[in-house]
Amino acid sequence: MASTGSARAFQADPYDYGEVRRLAAELELAEPVAVTLVRRGYRTVDAARRFLEARESHEPSEFRGMEEVCDRILAVARGPGRITIHGDYDVDGVTSTAILVSTLRSLGAECDWLIPDRLSDGYGLTMASVEQLQRRGTELVITVDCGIGSVEEVAAAQAAGIQVVVTDHHLPGEQLPDCPVIHPVVSGYPFEGLCAAGVAHKLATALCDAAGQGTVETVSGKRHPTDRDLDLVALATVADMVPLVGENRRLVREGLRVLRDSPRTGLRALMAAASVDPQTIDAGALSFRLAPRINAAGRLYRADAGVELMLTDDPDRAAAIAAELDRANGERRSAERKVVEGAERARSALPPSQADAPALVLAGEGWHPGVVGIAASRLVERHFRPTILLSVDGARAKGSARSIPGFDLVAALDATSEHLVRYGGHRAAAGLELDVDRLDAFRDAFLEHAASELDTADMVRMERLDALVGVGRDGIGMDLARQLESLGPFGMGNPGPRLLVPSGRLREVRPLGEDGKHSRFQLESGAGRAGGVAFGMNGEITRREDEALDLSVELEVDRWNGAEQPRVVVRELYALDDEPDESGRGRRPCGDGCPAPEVEWWARFDRELASVADGRPGALLNVRAPDGPRREQVDRRGGAAVASLAELISSGESVLAICADAARRAKLASAAADPRRFGAARPRIACCRCGSASLDAALTVPSGAGLALVDWTGVALRPDAVRSFRHVVVIDPPPSEALEGLARATEVGGYTHLAWGPGELRLSERLLDREWELRGAIAEIWRALPEAGGEAEGGPLRSALEGASDYPRTPETAARCVRVLCELDLCEWLPDRGTGALGVLSSERTDLGRSRSYGACLARHQETIRFLQARAQA
């Protein structure tokens, strides 16, 4: 959706550009990828390499008590006793159950499963579950994805003669069940982020090893029997929204490989029902296509349909179950929509103090308890505040809570637990149950707690950006798309990279899809274009066509019919600064100090006049670069200058941009340093016509993010000031070797970025024509002077010399023209009149070639053009 407010709903963390350069060089990464890694905390080459390789792995034996647990389980498995896997009704619980059932059966155990009914049984191991296990004659129950909080239930099971092993990953309470526990935190496992299926996989691996059925050598390398279950581990890891970092990255990557190469019968059928191509399946398909269908059965019907699907080898049976899950998912969407609509009505009926509070607690009768959790997530997306939805059934209300970053749901429920019958969950998601007569008191207490923990800023959805890019070199294109893809799998803890295209434009917008809600377009940034799409935004996209915008996008590899191409997916549109843009009006972009005060202007005029008279026109071109260290040079030519500048500004390091004429480049600077983007100040601009106050202000290194823009004249006038900036970005090529050297001089280390291309070269050549090929300027000045015998001085003379253009001539150009006029005996310079005066001696036509200075200026012109062209070839 579009954002047009004054506060920008995104942020990009500052970083050390040196770290980015090291990663890019040593790991051969495009700079936006290196920036993304550094911003995400992978700041060293070793840390980034480990992340990219995703090889982290730990042995199951690193769970304390694993050997004891395996001995206990195998003792039952080798006998006649029944083992029951007690799971849960979501994807993580279903897949964990399937992993252990299949493993134990392969080891010869009599093994079945028990998945509680969400509606009638509730979550986890309950007293009703214990009674059911007794009736089955279960000798050993292994909980998966539950049990860590079931202290009383475990005790009851053991009292009934049932052995218990708890495997779980949920947050443990103060008291643990009195039985063997396999849990990433409780058992001291090196990686605490495993989901329940990950824990079950580790247990299954340990069981096979203990039973002598571990790793074997195959033609394709070492294989473990439980490698076949990595597809289920990947599915659960993504679906349960555990962080996709550390060992989870390896598990999901390897699981996706299993899904692509040899999917099990049940998942092959489910992928067909969900229209997912196994060859291109990714974490997004797991999260948004497969997981909802498995969860739908647990929300509405029988969760063990998912277990049966994972275990069956019968294609016909798998297809039937997959079709059942697909139908359930359609019904789930309908039920979810009804709950969301009912919740919005309930919110509207609340008094403003509750409807607009930092959290929402909403209740209603007839809300399907199986979908209140996902409906709560929808309300969080809309209103961006912690939300609890409760389904009322008689005197009891059951529901789910979903949170926003920075608000701990478990802590909030702990603080209000006196009103609850039971609750549990994570920081971001929880379930709860209470008596209806405590609902109002609970709502008041929960809202009070939320108000004490959250402020207004917390309830603004903050989009965290990874990098700022344009179209072209190191920007949007196939190479970057492929490199960004290598950062996957994406999900919780490792979201897909979000890029910002600063000051981009949407061109050639066309509707997409049968209902026209979507759109395709060409995204323009700098001189480059890339194809893109936006989903559900066609109206907004169409209204904003051709407008300069900041666009939050994802860049993906679009695969279709064996072909690949980069595709931009727009997620958010942000309006640029809507204050009046005064760039392009010559005298205004630099502020009050432009043009220079009289004394300064005439001093520069006199200096150049003397240089021309000595046969050395353009003395500023020859300012000597100071001795000392030189900056590292970064070649950004062929990229988008606005994006390059904006990215460097976002780093928080000082940035100086140098161009041919800062007044003409003011619009570019404003686009790169929009003050609402990162809280940066407006760009500080000083052009070749400015006075020293403006120039000194522009070249003062800022304390925070910001941009200074000067032209090569400013660099020549203040050569030492350039050295204090961390980054110097060369927007237009330097007109001389001396000025080129100044751009690389440094006292703080740093970088010189070459950001010019053919267009900038052409502009520089045109401006050099204006500055050195004086015929047109002389003719214009001549027409503005009095008739022969007259004089011009002071303000009128300066006006004649500057001209009426939005971009007045500099004192140096004016001085060259006056020197030529004097050498041709058309004028006489009268230096004794204070600011100077010019007497007109003749109005006769003459040949400019008679002037020695005119020839010297032409020679200087050709010298600078040759230098520019040589640099263009370098």
Where are these regions (language model features)?
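Structural motif
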Residues: 40, 144, 363-366, 634, ...
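Conserved motor-coupling elements within RecA-like helicase/translocase cores
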Residues: 675, 681-726
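Active-site cavity-forming subdomains of large catalytic enzyme subunits
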Residues: 131-220, 245
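Short, ordered loop/turn segments at secondary-structure junctions
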Residues: 88-89, 116-119, 146-147, 162, ...
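Hydrophobic helix-and-loop "lid/oligomerization" segment in the mid-to-C-terminal part
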Residues: 2, 13-139, 160, 209-437, ...
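Acidic, two-metal ion nucleic-acid-processing modules in DNA metabolism proteins
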Residues: 249-292, 296-346, 381, 401-645, ...
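C-terminal helicase lobe
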Residues: 228, 702, 719-720, 724-725, ...
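Short alpha-helices
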Residues: 99, 175-218, 226-238, 437, ...
